[in-house]
Regions:
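Membrane-embedded transmembrane helical bundles of large multi-pass transporters/channels
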Residues: 1-47, 101, 128-371, 546, ...
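Structural signature of multi-pass, alpha-helical inner-membrane proteins
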Residues: 2-4, 8-30, 37-41, 56, ...
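Acidic/glycine-enriched edge-of-secondary-structure segments
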Residues: 43-57, 367-380, 498-513
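Juxtamembrane segments of multi-pass membrane proteins
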Residues: 52-54, 58, 69-75, 83, ...
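Extracytoplasmic
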Residues: 56-61, 68-69, 81-123, 158-161, ...
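Generic recognition of flexible, low-complexity loop/linker segments
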Residues: 65, 387-391, 414-418, 522-528, ...
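A short beta-strand structural signal in non-transmembrane regions
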Residues: 74-82, 92, 107-164, 398-406, ...
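A structural signal for short secondary-structure junctions
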Residues: 393-397, 423, 519-520, 528-534, ...
Length: 837
């Protein structure tokens, strides 16, 4: 069939081009999807959440210094339960003999043996990702397979891979639920594959372009696909239903063009609230907000693109199947709920007001936490179970690193001594307090005589060694004044001796050489962990939890102690400092997101409804759902990870507000045709399928994430999102209608109109049957009409009019005869929504 030239408005021309050039778009999508499949492998995922801390925080700066200057070897806490102390000693010996294990700390103190359980602190020869460490850990697991063993370690743990595996299972389960929901809410069974293919293309395009962001967080990488589906599936459903409506009176091509031209502005407007809510995340000081905002907004934009450019072609291809598989409406009417809302319009709002006030106070007292180490998820990994078991038996193991400028062993020694004297400190470790031999510490300064006695060297050899060291350090004055009182730190002298032996400048006897080689190996590892050219690292083990008021206060005490010996360029790094930095920025980020997300949504609603009052009413309901949602942790006395609040807050305000918009839009339109009480009942019936579809998908997706992932951050987001969506649905269905009814006066008095030019150029159209008319019409109409009319009528008027309507000439018959009133009622029941003439 020859394609017709596009007619009408610019939007119709765009729609015509997309529909007629669908094969071109299919080809472009094929290339884009193949590219995206390949490009998904280019995406870099960041698993360390501290990477997104602001650059000016102590933790971020300290981590940068620490990672650039030191090596951190892998460690493991291995607990073996139900063993005697003698058995534990044998196990310790076996662990020490494993290749790849540097050391095993174990003794008869309660720190390592308690309640018939032994705790071994294992240090590996490599980092957490090195093969030697991973292989050694596997050997430990095999060796202890016959014991009741719990191993808490980060060695060999691939957080990203584990999370992706969990999310794949969640996505499959979510897809099953989605197909069931779409089947229930669809008008034809063949619509479901169209919707799934459209979304699948959008999701793949988004994943395939994530590499453009450089590196994305593990949070964005794991939850974006499911959130994209839950947030954007409405767009495809709107176009699908538009096409179904238009196809009642038009052929496939014309119906698709008409549906797309009307759906583009409608869907674009609907997406603005979601995008604005997500956009608020980008203003967070914590970089994870910008990361999630970028990836999720990109996901929404790709969803829009797929709906506008791919889905019309799919509708054309599946048109016959859609017609052949139509089924009756499977979603029941909820007239009973509408009648309940009408009957309780003076009861529910006051109760809701009280609930909002109470939950606002409770939400403000929500017990937020900033470390997820001790959070317990519904599903726990083997490592999490081990961590809890060891914690319950031997207590916390809270380690922080103190980084100071290198070169002043006396200050390091005194600082470590001051820290050891604090009751909050379990133990400390640094070059200045590590035992060497014969009671000496590594940082102790020795004379040539003391060195000769310690190392078993002739005094002349020791003196020559000291002379060489003085020359190497350009301390020629020591050679002139005599070397007898010249003191050199033991660690520095050993490292100098190693360099000289390596260069062949010094040769020692075989036995001494072998002894020193073993010593040098240990010293090299100590230096890699504790000293660089610029900094020294002191390790401090605290008797405090990672997150508590006492811990935060003691960090201030540590800063004060450090300041006694160092004026600048010092850092404290650890999970506790991370908690302190995150908590200090949370208040500002929280206020910023709450205000911006609400402000963006209000501005959009203001111009959508052309009323200042209605947006406020909608915001009150959704903000109420947010407060109720986050009052639950307070009531349950459960800690909530702060990111769960920040992210879900913006999603609820940006996405759940759509449920309120749908009901309000239908109500605003319907109350022009019927009384407000009847309009709100009809609005609920019309809006329920949309809310049921979107709400069920988002709630189920959130619930699945919350109960099926072991990652505490992701679980917190999922739990809060699922619970918040359910609360939002309940409020918009059982509270918002009452507020709209009693708030009509406010809405009407705060309404305004935006004058826009009217294009009077029209083509003649002919149609018959049941139809909805929207726009300027000039010509002859024969039938029963129910509409707002402003203009000139040349003929006979026989109709019921609302109060305030002016008609000339006077005394027309304002009321329909009973038979025509019945005909009008039948027309209202059977008209085809969306038909325009």
């Amino acid at each position: 069939m020859e394609e017709q030239k596009p007619k009408g408005s610019g939007m119709e021309k765009i729609a015509t081009f997309i529909v007629d050039k669908r094969n071109l778009f299919f080809l472009l999508y094929a290339f884009a999807l193949i590219f995206s499949i390949v490009a998904t492998g280019w995406v870099k995922v960041e698993n360390d959440i501290t990477t997104y801390l602001p650059e000016d925080t102590e933790t971020r700066q300290g981590l940068t210094v620490m990672n650039d200057n030191f090596v951190t070897y892998g460690t493991a806490r291995v607990m073996v339960s139900n063993v005697t102390y003698e058995t534990a000693e044998n196990i310790c010996s076996d662990l020490e003999s494993i290749d790849g294990v540097t050391s095993v700390d174990f003794d008869d103190t309660t720190d390592h043996y308690k309640s018939a359980s032994a705790l071994f602190s294992v240090t590996f020869d490599g980092t957490t990702t090195d093969d030697i460490s991973v292989h050694a850990l596997h050997t430990i697991r095999d060796m202890l397979a016959g014991y009741d063993t719990y191993i808490d370690t980060e060695v060999g743990v691939d957080t990203s891979a584990d999370l992706q595996s969990e999310m794949s299972v969640i996505l499959v389960l979510a897809a099953i639920v989605i197909v069931l929901v779409l089947t229930l809410t669809s008008r034809s069974y063949a619509e479901v594959p169209v919707l799934i293919m459209t979304f699948g293309a959008a999701a793949l395009l988004n994943m395939g372009t994530n590499f453009l962001c450089g590196t994305i967080s593990f949070i964005s990488n794991s939850v974006t696909v499911i959130l994209q589906l839950a947030l954007a599936i409405d767009y495809a459903i709107i176009l699908c239903h538009r096409f179904s409506d238009e196809h009642e009176t038009k052929d496939t091509r014309e119906a698709c063009i008409a549906a797309l031209s009307k759906a583009i502005p409608e869907i674009s407007s609907s997406s603005l609230t979601t995008i604005s809510g997500l956009g608020a995340l980008a203003f967070m000081h914590f970089g994870i907000g910008r990361d999630m905002a970028t990836v999720l907004i990109k996901a929404i934009l790709f969803s829009l693109l797929s709906v506008f450019t791919l889905m019309p072609g799919l509708l054309m291809v599946f048109s016959k199947k859609i017609d052949a598989t139509r089924h009756k409406n499977l979603i029941p009417k909820i007239t009973f709920l509408g009648k309940f809302d009408v009957a309780t319009r003076f009861i529910v709002p006051p109760i809701f007001a009280v609930v909002v006030v109470v939950t606002a106070v409770l939400a403000n007292k929500c017990p937020y936490c900033y470390s997820y180490t001790d959070l317990v998820t519904a599903k726990q990994s083997e490592s999490q179970i081990a961590h809890q078991k060891i914690k319950n038996t031997f207590g916390v193991n809270n380690m922080v690193a103190v980084i100071v400028p290198t070169g002043d062993y006396d200050s390091e020694r005194q600082l470590l001594k001051d820290l050891d004297s604090c009751a909050e400190v379990k133990s400390t470790q640094g070059l200045a307090n590590i035992d060497a031999m014969d009671g000496y510490k590594l940082a102790d300064a020795l004379t040539p005589r003391q060195m000769s006695e310690l190392a078993g060297l002739d005094y002349e050899v020791a003196e020559a060694l000291y002379a060489a060291y003085a020359v190497d350090q350009n301390e020629y004055g020591k050679l002139i004044s005599g070397l007898g009182d010249y003191k050199v730190p033991l660690f520095d002298m050993f490292m100098f001796l190693q360099r000289e032996m390596k260069d062949g400048n010094i040769t020692l006897d075989g036995d001494i050489q072998e002894t020193l080689d073993d010593l040098f190996e240990q010293l090299n590892k100590a230096q890699l962990q504790l000293q660089s050219d610029k900094y020294s690292r002191l390790v401090v083990y605290l008797n405090l939890p990672e997150e508590s008021d006492e811990t935060m206060d003691f960090l201030d005490t540590m800063h004060a102690l450090i300041a006694k010996y160092y004026s600048s360029d010092t850092y404290i790094v650890g999970n506790s400092t991370n908690v302190k930095d995150l908590s200090s920025s949370f208040g500002e980020d929280n206020l910023l997101i709450s205000v911006l997300s609400a402000l963006f949504v209000v501005i959009i609603l203001l111009f959508t409804f052309k009323s200042a009052g209605l947006p406020v009413l909608l915001i009150v309901v959704i903000q109420g759902s947010i407060w109720i949602n986050f009052s639950v942790p307070t009531i349950q006395h459960e800690s909530l990870y702060f990111l769960g609040y920040l992210i879900v807050n913006s999603i609820q305000m940006g996405a759940n507000i759509d449920y309120a918009i749908v009901i309000s839009s239908h109500y605003t339109d319907l109350k022009k045709e019927m009384r407000p009480k009847e309009a709100i009942i009809a609005a609920l019936n019309e809006a329920f399928p949309t809310i049921f579809t979107s709400g069920t998908i988002l709630a189920v997706a959130g619930a699945l994430i919350g109960v099926m992932t072991t990652n505490p951050v992701i679980a917190a987001i999922g739990t809060c999102l699922g619970r918040g969506t359910v609360i939002s649905i309940v409020l918009v269905m059982a509270v918002l209608p009452q507020i709209l009814l009693i708030g009509d006066t406010i809405v009407e008095r705060t309404s305004f109109d935006v004058k826009v030019p009217v294009d009077l150029s029209r083509v003649n159209r002919t149609a018959s049957g049941n139809m909805r008319v929207s726009g300027r019409v000039r010509g002859y109409v024969n039938g029963v009409i129910d509409a707002e009319i402003k203009g000139t009528l040349n003929g006979t008027l026989n109709a019921s009019v609302t109060s305030g309507t002016t008609i000339e000439p006077t005394k027309p018959d304002f009321y329909l005869p009973e038979s025509k009133e019945q005909a009008a009622a039948e027309w209202a029941e059977n008209y085809t929504e969306g038909e325009e003439v």
